[in-house]
A protein has these predicted regions:
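Sec-dependent N-terminal signal peptides
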Residues: 6-17
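N-terminal secretory signal peptides that target proteins for export/translocation
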Residues: 1-3
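Exported/extracytosolic protein signature
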Residues: 18-21, 27-229
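Ser/Thr/Gly/Pro-rich low-complexity, disordered linker/stalk segments of secreted
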Residues: 223-248
């Protein structure tokens, strides 16, 4: 299956668009509202993450998930994080166009062009604070040109969160499988996706789908103890009154 879409904007315009996207995402974990498809009835042009019954992931609009490393637990959209542990983020991508529309007879409308991905996560969470991990996919020739989703994390204790260097990797069934991704993933520019190379071209069909993974480490934050209350000063004892004079 395949889906294609064009969006000819410069990096500055992309940054402005992302600001609007991430601010509007508070109302919806995913967005924008868009037509949906099924595995039996995929799209007839390039479009990302809009199939609702994907056998691998379910509803593709829910495409950002997180799990604790080596926990044996599945990826989820909501997780409690603890200090001094590693977590792995998964961002799924799929051009939902039917493969038929990749050929020249159909003007290659199944191809998505200039496909980029970016992700953002909080640097610090206070105890009990809930934060979000954003995943965003943009293209230059699809409608919508940008799709996004969020996973949510809640801190059991106060923590900082840091990217584990060189953990970002693309996984798929094509030549780019296993390619490490730069930290541009965490900027408004993002990183290019691709199949035979990371050139931004993603044909339609599930055989060209994939995931981007990266890891986050949490570190406990030392909390200063409440200061000891200062003792109240001991009041001076009542002064001894002067003796009354003897009567003459």
């Amino acid at each position: 299956m395949k889906k294609t879409k064009q969006w000819l904007l410069g990096v500055a315009a992309v940054a402005m668009s992302l600001s609007l996207v991430l601010n509007s995402a508070a109302a919806n974990a995913w967005g924008p509202e868009r037509p949906t498809y099924t595995m039996a009835k995929p799209a007839e042009k390039a479009v990302f993450n809009s199939i609702t019954d994907n056998a691998a992931i379910g509803d593709e609009r829910d495409f950002v998930r997180i799990a604790e490393v080596n926990s044996g637990k599945p990826f989820t959209s909501e997780l409690i994080v603890e200090p001094d542990k590693d977590y792995i983020v998964m961002i799924y991508y799929h051009n939902d166009a039917l493969a038929t529309f990749n050929d020249t007879a159909h003007n290659r409308v199944g191809f998505a062009e200039n496909v980029r991905m970016m992700s953002f996560f909080p640097e610090k969470l206070d105890k009990g604070e809930r934060g979000k991990i954003d995943g965003v996919i943009t293209t230059s020739n699809t409608d919508p040109a940008t799709v996004w989703d969020e996973a949510y994390i809640t801190a059991r204790e106060a923590v900082t969160l840091s990217y584990i260097e060189w953990s970002a990797v693309i996984r798929n069934q094509k030549k780019t499988d296993g390619t490490l991704l730069s930290k541009a993933l965490f900027t408004n520019e993002g990183v290019l996706l691709g199949t035979n190379s990371l050139n931004g071209l993603v044909p339609g069909c599930d055989e060209y789908a994939g995931q981007v993974y990266y890891r986050i480490h949490t570190t406990s934050v030392a909390v200063d103890p409440d200061p000891e209350p200062e003792p109240e000063p001991t009041p001076d004892p009542d002064p001894t009154p002067d003796p009354e004079p003897e009567p003459e």
